[in-house]
Amino acid sequence: MKVSYEELKSEFKRVLLSRNVREDIAEECATVFADTTQAGAYSHGVNRFPRFIQQLENGDIKPEAQPTKVLSLGAIEQWDAHQAIGNLTAKKMMDRAMELASQNGVGIVALRNANHWMRGGSYGWQAAEKGYIGICWTNALAVMPPWGAKECRIGTNPLIVAVPTTPITMVDMSCSMYSYGMLEVHRLQGRQTFVDAGFDDNNNPTRDPATVEKNRRLMPMGFWKGSGLSIVLDMIATLLSNGESTAAVTEDKDDEYCVSQVFIAIEVDRLIDGKTKDEKLNRIMDYVKTAEPVDPNQPVRLPGHEFTTILADNKANGIPVDDTVWAKLKSL
């Protein structure tokens, strides 16, 4: 089914207000969830909203909390989220990273005691739209086995890198081949994943999303490489924020909250003039896109470029929402 932006936002806000979230905060939060869904990140927009409400009801998310600055070292700052709403806090932290970058050329904000930020790509995109290179990542609950193991000991720890090209070029990826949100999307659509998503109970690679959702044996992105990347991202976020690690969140909390996040903005225009920047970026993009495709009907594309098309289509024709997801939202 398809719904309008306003209808979707209205449902989000209705649910938030019914949970006694303050009106202005409910409006802002509903807007971000609607924006995320309209942009095509369904797995971390409308699909994720019931989980967000569950954590709100459990007290993991404190809707009226506000982040505070703990430490300032020029271009680097350390903040405490106090378990505030994750996507609203992340937006503020990338804004702060850009403010620091405008003063220093680069801005780094490390955040502790944060909640799930939903679609991490929103914050990289936020920076790139204003001409900055945006980089951010978060640690998470241990929901993936390290390479060679059966038990979950590392997080999917999404990493985002956004470059201010036209359209914006952005990598938004978890350290697993698929996030649990994307596994849900595939399962709801009744299809297998395009590549191996994890391991079955007999240690064989599988493309069945339901199997991996159940046994929690995600495939790390690039096998041992994704496993290693998850570990070092966790270490850096923990150290820069003086916050909780994946191990601490998993062992000491009863759910995924109080995670650690890093937001980086780079004012590239201080390093290169606009004309030269555009020429260099266009050459890179043209060189990649003109590679001969394996399938003539599937032209080579750059990461993130599809979101511009998806957003335009969803604005014009309505936002696709799975029937079961919509029913669940209406029941909240």
Curated annotation (Swiss-Prot):
Keywords of this entry: Cytoplasm, NAD, Oxidoreductase
DNA-binding listed as a keyword: no
A molecular function (GO) term: 3-dehydro-L-gulonate 2-dehydrogenase activity
Domain of life the protein comes from: Bacteria
Catalytic activity: 3-dehydro-L-gulonate + NAD(+) = 2,3-dioxo-L-gulonate + NADH + H(+); 3-dehydro-L-gulonate + NADP(+) = 2,3-dioxo-L-gulonate + NADPH + H(+)
Residues noted as binding NAD(+) in the record, renumbered to the chain: 168-174, 224-225, 304-306
Cell compartment(s), UniProt: Cytoplasm
EC number: 1.1.1.130
InterPro entries in the cross-refs: Diketo_gul_Rdtase, Mal/L-sulf/L-lact_DH-like_ah, Mal/L-sulf/L-lact_DH-like_NADP, Mal/L-sulfo/L-lacto_DH-like_sf, Malate/L-lactate_DH-like
Predominant location category: cytoplasm
Gene3D superfamilies xrefs: 1.10.1530.10, Hypothetical oxidoreductase yiak, domain 2
GO cellular component: cytoplasm
Active site: 44
NCBIfam families membership: PRK13260.1
PANTHER family on file: 2,3-DIKETO-L-GULONATE REDUCTASE, OXIDOREDUCTASE-RELATED
Protein family membership: Belongs to the LDH2/MDH2 oxidoreductase family. DlgD subfamily.
Assembly and interaction partners: Homodimer.
Function description: Catalyzes the reduction of 2,3-diketo-L-gulonate in the presence of NADH, to form 3-keto-L-gulonate.
The name this protein goes by in its record: 2,3-diketo-L-gulonate reductase
Source organism per UniProt: Mannheimia succiniciproducens (strain KCTC 0769BP / MBEL55E)
Record lineage: Bacteria, Pseudomonadati, Pseudomonadota, Gammaproteobacteria, Pasteurellales
